[in-house]
Regions:
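WD40/WD-repeat beta-propeller blade N-cap
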Residues: 15-22, 58-64, 107-114, 149-156, ...
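A structural motif specific to WD40 beta-propellers
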Residues: 52-55, 96, 102-105, 144-147, ...
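Extended acidic/polar alpha-helical scaffold segments
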Residues: 779-899
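Blade-level signature of beta-propeller repeat domains, shared across WD40, Kelch, NHL, RCC1
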Residues: 690-721
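Intrinsically disordered, low-complexity acidic/Ser/Thr/Pro-rich linker and tail segments
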Residues: 1-55, 66, 75-87, 91-97, ...
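Conserved strand-to-loop turn within each blade of WD40 beta-propeller repeats
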Residues: 38-40, 79-82, 128-132, 200-204, ...
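WD40-repeat beta-propellers
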Residues: 43-47, 85-90, 135-139, 207-211, ...
Length: 899
């Protein structure tokens, strides 16, 4: 058949979860539609409502020291360690919502690095604070300095613009005025007209309030003895709140600039501000908790909260009136969003919990897997003690205020929950057949089983398994699907898996019986191991359970893989052959067709797949524990292997057995188990790929890497096959059409189609036929006026393509005359400006217009020189003939005399 094409396996990048924040400043616009974050030297703009990437602004080669957004979202200001300050104008595209950032200006803001920025509410003024203690105020639009303030010569740690409230003078106008009242009226008049102030906090604990109109310091507030990190002003309360690393929170009267309240927070405070029209004050710091205070009394309204881990400590915070949340930045680069409470809720206020988390970076992705029956969540082990659950559902994200509702659908890549319980880094995980149960193993020498009830927003630890002496490098749950009529099949949430297998760096494997009821929190006894076996001579890297739940395999750094009986814990076979440690092992799935080996088809117990540090993958026969085939192609260790799903076709002979592998070379490969060849190589990572998993229905491959990215690869094999068949069919139709035009003598249509199909041989044949026609048209340059018209109406792409062909033909003396004739036709058909201004995509290197014309000129000069030499030689022949004619009379006379 014409459309029968060889089957080709292809995968394309469908989604990528990338890091957006690696520490530093965070900024938001008033509508919470633009989130600006620091990613090393670059700035990232993201829509926090749907996680969409809006723009990436490349840096100047130095790390960013701080950045900010104007409240209106019109400008982005970036300061780097190179001492430069760049101001970008932001314009949102109406088509896809992305943002185009245009560099408005670059200036040297200070003689030392700028570490803090602030913008006023009108988005017109910018304040910059340097490490030398100086503060400058800039006009953002014009780009010049309006004010320069110098206080103490220590680092500026906080800046905040505010406007003092204009006080009413009505009472003062009634009756007799005292001198104090007159002074107050004069101050009120100034405040009503020139009310801009700038509060500046320094590393020495002092806070200065600068009057922008008078260009002087109106208050010097001394209460803190360490860095001032939080500054905010409330017009309703006429108060300024300051917070510092001296573990105190201070409220100041904005009229007299005297202290109203000082509260010890007993933690390093990194963020503070007013909420609910200043009636409440929030603070957050090293303990990682959001705390709410009554502004009037200074009393804490939130209940006492236990300090969180060091990684969950708060590094900075952000809130302004109108925002639907308080944004707190954690030390581990997570952005936690909290709902701001109201004072009316003070009596029932509980410990605040974030309603949404945005992971700035997932760090190294050590392991991952799909969760839930619909596989709408992915569990990530991310070089931390918590397991992150991320949404991968394709639901359309909502915009506006509804995006922050608790019942709004999570967008692709949104953090849904954290599984908190381990004390050390989680290094392995496994998921059962239903997707509701996940087992984790960590460096705290324990394994945990988690129950995932996403519908009810419940993610709880079901049981903890303690007994290993060292880190757990491998955990495995049974993958077999229970019988249709069983309770485990109909209600998997209330029927945990029957057992768990764990492997540790203590070189032992353990089988655990999973309790039918959840362990109580704080329960110390835990579950007991059914058996413990000394399994290997080195660390155990991976464990996998056979789909029948009768066998399990353990892979170790001792270069071997052992097959065990689940029931007795006895070794059934040992797989030897790898030259380095084995990182991954996977049994073949159920109902897999037979694999063709050297000794015929492999049936019976099936096969097992292993990936090793020796850069190879091996396929083993479980019947006799021999190697069927070795797969080579990775240039570094093979860290993970996983089987792809079988096609749905009923014909077993047509089912392709494929698997995927992830390597330390940063590549993901898809292999054909029967041919031993790599079907395709997937490249989207910059570091080693530790984890890979396959969607059980659509064959989507998800890979996690040390570069903090998670890539989702969509299987496009059927689309590629259909497109290739369609392209082949179209090519055949066009070739037949070309033959028909040539046969009919329709040179105009034939040349146009030959150019379109890029058939240089047929194009040359056509032009040769035109030039050698027996009845050329009078006045035609090429030989036929129809061809002249075709050559005179070509697009830029077609002209460039034809010039490429003329360049090639011109190098051969046999085809050069055709090239010269067509070149003449082109030159006479278009002005010189047409050739100099050709707009052609991809015309680079040897195919650039300059190089093409140069090659044509060089060979044309060579042909011209050869023609000149032929002309000169023709004169010599003519001269010789003339001389011979001059000798003819003498020869005739000699003949007569001889006669």
């Amino acid at each position: 058949m014409a459309n029968k094409q060889p089957l080709k396996t292809t995968f394309d990048v469908d989604h990528v979860i990338r890091p957006i924040f690696t520490g530093g400043s965070v900024a938001l616009d008033n509508g919470a539609r633009i989130l600006a974050t620091v990613l090393g030297e670059d700035a990232i703009l993201t829509d926090p409502t749907n996680g969409k990437h809006l723009a990436q602004i490349e840096g100047d080669g130095e790390l960013i020291s701080t950045l900010t957004l104007t409240p209106s979202g019109s400008h982005l200001i970036i300061c780097s360690r190179s001492l430069s300050m760049r101001i970008y104008a932001l314009k949102r595209s109406e088509d896809d919502g992305s943002i185009e950032a245009t560099l408005a200006r670059t200036v040297k803001a200070h003689g030392t690095p700028v570490v803090v920025l602030a913008v006023d509410r009108t988005s017109t003024l910018l304040a910059t604070g340097g490490t030398d203690g100086s503060v400058k105020v800039w006009d953002i639009a014009a780009g010049y300095v309006t004010h320069t303030f110098r206080g103490s010569s220590v680092l500026v740690s906080a800046l905040h613009f505010f406007e003092v409230a204009a006080r009413s003078n009505e009472a003062a106008r009634k009756g007799k005025k005292s001198k104090h009242q007159e002074d107050s009226d004069e101050e009120d008049e100034n405040a009503s007209t020139t009310n801009f102030r700038l509060a500046c906090g320094n590393q020495d604990g002092k806070v200065r309030v600068w009057d922008l109109h008078k260009r002087s310091c109106v208050a010097n507030l001394e209460s803190h003895v360490s860095d001032v990190q939080g500054l905010d002003y409330s017009a309703e309360q006429h108060a300024l709140v300051t917070a510092g690393r001296d573990k105190t929170l201070t409220w100041w009267d904005a009229k007299s600039w005297k202290i109203r309240k000082v509260v010890p927070c007993l933690e390093l405070v990194e963020a503070a501000g007013f909420i609910d029209d200043g009636q409440l004050t929030y603070s957050a710091g090293a303990n990682g908790c959001l705390r709410i205070w009554d502004t009037d009394t200074g009393k804490e309204l939130t209940p006492q909260q236990a300090a969180k881990s060091e990684e969950e400590g708060i590094a900075s915070g952000l809130y302004r009136p109108g925002l639907p949340f308080i944004l707190l930045v954690q030390v581990d680069h997570t952005l936690a969003l909290y709902r701001p409470p109201k004072k009316a809720e003070a009596s029932t206020l509980s410990a605040p919990e974030p309603f949404r988390r945005i992971s700035g970076t997932h760090d190294d992705i050590i392991d991952l897997g799909y969760l839930l029956p619909d596989r709408s969540l992915v569990a990530l082990a991310t070089n931390s003690e918590d397991v992150r659950l991320v949404s991968v559902s394709e639901t359309e994200a909502q915009a506006g205020e509804s995006a922050w509702d608790s019942d709004s659908s999570p967008y692709f890549g949104q953090d849904v929950a954290l599984l908190k319980g381990h004390d050390e880094i989680v290094i392995s995980l496994d998921i059962d057949w239903s997707g509701h149960w996940i087992a984790t193993g960590a460096k705290d020498n324990t394994a945990k089983l988690w129950r995932i009830d996403h519908a009810n927003n419940s993610y709880t630890c079901w049981a903890t398994f303690s007994g290993h002496a060292e880190s757990l490098g491998a955990v495995a749950l049974p993958k077999g699907v229970p019988p249709e009529s069983s309770a485990a099949r109909s209600d998997p949430l209330n029927n945990p898996p029957p057992f768990l297998i764990t492997g540790s760096q203590d070189q032992t494997v353990k089988k655990w019986e999973i309790p039918r009821t959840a362990q109580q929190k704080g329960h110390k006894t835990g579950s007991r191991a059914v058996f413990t076996r000394k399994a290997h001579d080195k660390d155990i890297n991976a464990i996998n359970v056979h789909h029948s739940s009768q066998l399990f395999a353990s892979a170790s750094q001792d270069k071997t893989v052992k097959i065990w009986s689940v029931a007795e814990g006895e070794v059934q076979g040992i797989l030897r052959g790898h030259k380095r440690g084995v990182w991954s092992v996977q049994f073949s799935p159920a109902q897999m067709p037979a694999i063709q080996g050297e000794d015929g088809a492999v049936t019976g117990k099936g096969v097992v797949l292993t990936g090793s540090g020796d850069k190879t993958i091996k396929l083993w026969n479980l019947a006799n524990y021999t190697c069927i085939r070795t797969f080579e192609g990775h240039s570094n260790s093979v860290l993970k292997v996983a089987w792809l799903n079988m096609p749905s076709t009923q014909d077993q002979s047509k089912k392709r057995v494929q698997f995927t592998s992830a390597g330390g070379d940063g590549l993901v490969k898809v292999w054909d188990a029967n041919s031993g060849e790599a079907e395709c190589t997937l490249d989207n990572h910059e570091d080693r790929v530790w984890a890979v998993s396959v969607h059980p229905e659509n064959n989507t491959i998800v890979s996690g890497s040390g570069d903090s990215t998670v890539t989702f690869w969509k299987d496009t094999s059927s689309e590629t096959q259909a497109a290739a068949s369609q392209a082949a069919l179209k090519m055949i139709e066009q070739e037949q059409e070309l033959e028909n035009h040539i046969h009919a003598g329709s040179f105009r249509e034939a040349i146009t189609l030959a150019l379109q199909l890029n058939h240089p041989g047929r194009l040359l044949s056509l032009f040769t036929s035109v030039m050698t026609t027996s009845n050329p048209d009078k006045g035609s340059l090429s030989g036929l006026k129809a061809v002249d018209e075709v050559l005179g109406s070509l697009s830029d792409e077609q002209i460039f393509l034809l010039l490429l062909r003329l360049r090639d033909w011109n190098t051969n003396a046999r085809t050069a005359p055709v090239a010269q004739r067509i070149l003449l036709t082109l030159i006479r058909s278009y002005p010189a400006s047409k050739f100099s201004n050709l707009s052609v995509k991809g015309a680079q290197g040897q195919k650039s217009l300059k190089d093409v014309l140069h090659a044509i000129r060089v060979y044309t000069e060579r042909h011209y020189k050869r023609t000149e030499e032929l002309v000169d030689e023709s004169y010599l022949v003519e001269y010789t003939l003339q001389e011979m004619d001059a000798l003819a009379p003498a020869l005739d006379e000699d003949v007569v005399m001889a006669g």
